[in-house]
Amino acid sequence: MNKRIAALVLMLCMIVGAFAGTVYADIEKEAPMLAEMVADGTLPPLEDRIPTEADVYVETEYSPEETPVYGGTLRTNNGGMWYYGPFAEEPLFRLLDDGTVEQNVAKGYDLSDDGLVYTIYLREGMKWSDGTPFTATDCVYYYNYVLVTDVDNETGKVTKSNAGRYYNWYMTADENGVMRPAQVRYVDDTTFTITLYSPKPTLLQAIAIDNKWMFCPKEWYKDIMVNDASAAHWSGESDLKLIGGEGLPTITEEEALANALAKSELYNFENAAKLGDQLGYRYWQYAGRPTLRPWNNTSPLTDQTLVFERNPYYWKVDAEGRQLPYIDTIEFVSMDTNLYAQEKIAGNLDLVRFDASDFPIYKASEAIGNYRVATEILPNWAAVSFEFNQSYKDQQYRDLFANIDFRHAVSIAVDRDEVNEILYNGMMAPAQFAPAEGTAEYIEGAPEKWIEQDVDAANALLDGIEGISKDRNADGWRTFIGGEHDGQAITIEFETRADAPNDAQLVALLAKYFQPLGLQIVESNNTDNNTRNEKYYAGDVYMAAVNSSSGSFNVMLRPDAVAANRNNCAFTGKYGLEHADALTPEAGSDMEELVEATKALLSASTFEELQDAANRIVMSHYNSTWVIGILNSNKTFDAVANRIHNFREGFVSCDELRFLGNARPYSWFLAN
């Protein structure tokens, strides 16, 4: 007998009962701009735009206590695609602060008794932002034709160099221990199944975290995604069985690119892989692509201000039956980060997210700027850190980075109090890279390990490392002894981002602290986080990075920044299992333990196995200091215009919970 997940069903029954008969009674339960479009015949009535009365999503927890007001434009800074993307994200299931999931795009699910088959139920009558029906076909098509085409079915390896959009959380072990992708199949327009080879108790959490947009508009995509004999037929099944309905046309790469460009001049991509990555994974950036979000971009990415307009087919309503969102337009304004505070205080921006380094100026100007400073809670392992690529292509540097005495030496060379004062106005605290106190994974003493500055002890540790000199050359640097770099100064290049000015300042301070150790530090400045990530995907072409890893909200659910599963983790590099040419760690090495613990986590079929593997990963960091933490803080901040209502501060903010998206912007409204 199938086991219905009681929490989802109970919640659904309660909200349907409370909501029955109220949705369609009053035309004022939609934005005036939409009501005008209905009146002039350019938009269908509300009841034809949202799911059926039994299936519409009713937002009860975040409904405002005061009567909301429709309309207006909220202006905020453009912090890049990972700012405005999560801001309005709508996942299949939503992860909650306690690590459980709740219904969202999906209204519920069943799980078979053997734990292998998830049956997912969608909302009847739900539509994409262009008014076309949203069905299970869109989910099954996305999985089989957009996602797993990047995975070798026999090895589980990602087969394309830029395939960061595939996540290995759909992989489970078959009877021979081989990790294989799940099978996702169409049942009917509101139902599809996910079939695993072995149980994965956190599958829905994995979807909520790492493949939250497990859908795309098939009818819009089918002529712009390459489809040939090998595209999605790794399963050996027909188009009809995979997605229901008609089969898909054969599309060459040239045809896909031409068809995309014919849709819009904005879709001018150099190859099909880039097209799939941008329109399949980072789709929210592109005007014209249908979504399920409350607002959609209407601007070219090159515009200084990205204008996101309300989705007239948005499928959520508040407790009184008003269609969400309340705000008509969100504008994301690009400007120099140094101007954020000035523009906020002048009243030109409604919302600015900032860290501890800018707290004094924002706090002092609340009354002048007619705003309030609100707090977000961060579950960081570290807010400021640096790390070394354990797979760097040069063997002598790789051996140096792998030496734990080297990592401990550079850790205790850092004056953390000075970094705190110079970069963050003393608003943070010295800390090693470790789970914070108060979290389930906290280890007593771990945040204090190897953080007291001691230059003499650091030099003593370096003096004991074979292959590098104790003495300095004429310029004051230690050199390599033997090998290809014999007699050459040890020079370490740190990756930074131009759009994160504290990166460069931190590297300058590290250069100051490492100089007495005889280690030369230089900076490799990248234009932004995406450019830096391209080097991570390559795996072995960068040496070191600052402020790359913040840790993990929950290692069982999201180990990406602390384990060896991904192909873009800075310290693991090519030891990341997603790499098609992933390296095998040396037997008995610390990295071997991390990789094996990661494999155990990925193949775990019970919560006990998951917990054991997660504990091994945490202990690997405790014992090996893979990432060197400098400072930590459990807070970041928002300058919120007083005209923004229903903004609830104190929410947990992290990638897994989608940063500001966890404050449910669709429930905010503007009123003076």
What is the predicted role of each segment?
Residues 78-79, 83-97, 208-324, 329, ...:
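Gly/Pro-rich hinge or "lid" segments in bacterial periplasmic/extracellular proteins
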Residues 108-155, 187, 193-195, 203, ...:
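Aromatic- and charge-enriched surface segment that lines or borders ligand/interaction sites
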Residues 36-39, 44-113:
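N-terminal lobe/hinge region of extracytoplasmic solute-binding protein
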Residues 131, 340-359, 366-372, 515-574, ...:
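Periplasmic binding protein-like
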Residues 68-80, 107, 117-120, 139, ...:
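Short, well-ordered beta-strand elements
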Residues 60-86, 105, 203-213, 387, ...:
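A structural "hinge/loop" feature
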Residues 123, 279-286, 308, 313-364, ...:
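Ligand-site clamp/hinge motif
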Residues 216, 289, 295, 304-306, ...:
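Detector for C-terminal structural segments
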